[in-house]
Amino acid sequence: MYQKRQAPTLSSKEAAIQLLSRRDHGLYELHQKLAMKGYEEADIEAAINFCLEHNYLDDLRYAKSQVRQHVYKGHGERRIRQELNQKRVAESVIEQAMAEEPQDWFELAKLAAEKKFKGIKAKDQKEYAKQVRFLQYRGYSFDQISYALSFEDED
């Protein structure tokens, strides 16, 4: 039922470079992908060290690109932090990436609400709760959600 994995044809360094040529990866993510391809732990470490030395692998660059990508999708700060934590990016790197990619989270929450609800104010408490849940899922704080939803009635 299960096939035994064959030995990889590429060296671990070549495989790492091939993965990084398509898109940026985090250190942990690259480690996992190489392990899934069947490389030995020592080969994986050598490939990662090679990529770090030649600046092919950079967690800060990866985190900044993830922040930009999630902001474009309309996600809030909490969601972005959670995603980066799941990908095991160091907290200090996340802080630095967030500082280097400054955003107005209140305005982004407002834009996300306008896009989803087309500027229509909630008619009742049930509808308001639905809008709040949507923005919470997107990763916005309650202050940002309050700003986004109360701002609509002023237009």
Swiss-Prot record:
Gene3D superfamilies linked to this entry: Winged helix-like DNA-binding domain superfamily/Winged helix DNA-binding domain (1.10.10.10)
Cytoplasm listed as a keyword: yes
One BP annotation, GO: regulation of DNA repair
Places the protein is found: Cytoplasm
InterPro entries, per database record: RecX_HTH_1st (IPR053926), RecX_HTH_2nd (IPR053924), RecX_HTH_3rd (IPR053925), Regulatory_RecX (IPR003783), WH-like_DNA-bd_sf (IPR036388)
HAMAP family: RecX (MF_01114)
NCBIfam families associated with the record: PRK00117.3-3
Role played: Modulates RecA activity.
Protein family: Belongs to the RecX family.
Protein name: Regulatory protein RecX
Organism of provenance: Vibrio parahaemolyticus serotype O3:K6 (strain RIMD 2210633)
Recorded name of the encoding gene: recX
